[in-house]
Regions:
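C-terminal amphipathic alpha-helical segment
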Residues: 214-226
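N-terminal export/assembly leaders
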Residues: 47, 120-122, 138-163
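PEST-like low-complexity, intrinsically disordered acidic/proline/serine-rich tracts
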Residues: 124-126
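Assembly/oligomerization scaffold segments
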Residues: 1-117
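Polar, S/T/G-rich
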Residues: 81, 85, 131-144, 165-178, ...
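Short secondary-structure junction motifs
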Residues: 45, 89, 147, 181, ...
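Short beta-strand-centered interaction patches in the first periplasmic/extracellular domains
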Residues: 2-6, 96-98, 107-110, 114-116, ...
Length: 226
């Protein structure tokens, strides 16, 4: 295990080199990316937010916003690293495009989600037939979404008559996964469902006062099993 007071990097942690690609093409270097926020978690759809400095008060226009680069629905990829040794942090689609005007300046804010977001947009009803495994039903549902890859671990529960009734595909999938003691992950347009790993070697060790920047921890007795 490396020193817990530092986090190993492939290059010296000096110059950060972020890259944003839309439909596979890097955005112009003239666009000033002010902030990147990546949010990934279990049983949640991966999200990203870009804040770009945009707006010319003298010309009274927003060049980046007025263009067609960040039109909702376009594929986007965010990469970052040190000294151009970059790796992918997020892949997904643009879902929201907004501008903000403040006394301190103006911004273009782009919100993105993993392609699994399409699973949350409508409710469906479906009969899957007799004696079908939950993993097979989930694979069938996920296979109806273009651009989304499914990696579903085998599940032991078999239903005699499995029905999805007036539920979004995302709620149906997370519900069946929970019933089988599994977690749902969305990462780079891949839907992964597997059991949590509770053994093995730690990937990284974080230390309070050194590598831990923010932490929220709590215990809530209301949800503890007696």
């Amino acid at each position: 295990m490396a020193d817990s007071r530092t986090i190993e990097t492939t290059r010296p942690g000096t110059v950060v080199t972020p890259i944003v690609k839309v439909e596979g093409t890097e955005i112009p270097r003239t666009m000033q990316v002010e902030a990147m926020v990546i949010d990934k978690g279990v049983n949640r759809i991966a999200a990203a937010k870009l804040v770009i400095i945009d707006g010319d008060t003298s010309a009274q226009k927003f060049d980046a916003s007025n263009g067609d680069l960040f039109v909702p629905g376009k594929n986007i990829e965010i990469l970052c690293g040190y000294e151009s040794d970059n790796y992918t942090l997020f892949k997904g689609v643009v879902i929201k495009h907004s501008i903000k005007l403040r006394n301190s300046g103006s911004q273009l804010v782009i919100e993105c989600r993993d392609k699994a977001i399409a699973m949350t947009l409508a409710r469906h009803s479906k009969y899957f037939g007799e004696n079908i495994k939950d993993s097979d039903a989930i694979t069938t549902v996920a296979g109806t979404y273009s651009g989304l890859t499914a990696d579903v671990a085998d599940m032991n529960i078999t239903s005699s008559d499995l029905v999805q009734y007036e539920a979004t595909d995302w709620d149906f999938i997370t519900g069946r996964a929970e019933l089988n003691g599994m977690l749902v992950y969305t990462d780079d347009n891949t839907l992964s469902i597997k059991k949590p790993e509770i053994s093995g070697t730690a990937v990284v060790e974080l230390s309070f006062g050194a590598t831990m920047l923010e932490l929220d921890a709590e215990i809530d007795s209301r949800i503890q099993f007696p």
